Amino acid sequence: AASDVYKRQAQAFAQAGRPVQLAGFDIAKPAVRLAAKALPAAKYAVASSFAQPVRTGWADLLLNCFSPFAQEEFRRVLRPGGRMIYVVPGAEHLYQMKAVLYDTPYKNPVQEVAYEGFRPIGEREVSGSITVPAGQLEALFAMTPYYWKTPRDGAARLAALPELTTDIAFRFLVFEKE
């Protein structure tokens, strides 16, 4: 679904006489293969956010979803005045999943962020809920940091569920390179 959004946006820019180049990086080969199938017009590489295989000042816009903030590399890759959308979990993100995994579930910390060389220009939170069937719960769980620090009994409780309805919350933080 996200690839369709990127494809439509790229087409809209091209029709307006402003063609775009899209590139994506992930440290996971399966994620890169999946992205390349979904949006073949973009260029992809298995790479870390901390060492992106592009020239300095290449990007007008960076989108970083749930990955570490590679401040120096983002500053290098963005052109002056370029923008970055940094997507982080909101306070309630996957709260009901954590209630299954842990004896004492917790909300994600929501903190103000400041990054040298970047000026904050906007923020928006989007939230809702999803119902995840048993067949997809393990995949969702494996994409979270909880996968690596959850006690076995918590993971077993999650695996035993026929489905899980949980909150999702995303904070979109928008910055401009100074």
Model-derived regions, located:
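Conserved S-adenosyl-L-methionine
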Residues: 118-128
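Class I SAM-dependent methyltransferase SAM/SAH-binding core
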Residues: 7-52
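Short, small-residue-biased leader/transition segments that mark boundaries at the very start
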Residues: 1-6
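A short acidic, Gly/Pro-enriched loop at the edge of an enzyme's catalytic core
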Residues: 50-62
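Conserved beta-strand signature within the Rossmann-like core of class I S-adenosyl-L-methionine
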Residues: 81-93
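Conserved Class I S-adenosyl-L-methionine
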Residues: 98-120, 126-178
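Short alpha-helix immediately C-terminal to the canonical SAM-binding loop
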Residues: 32-33, 71, 94
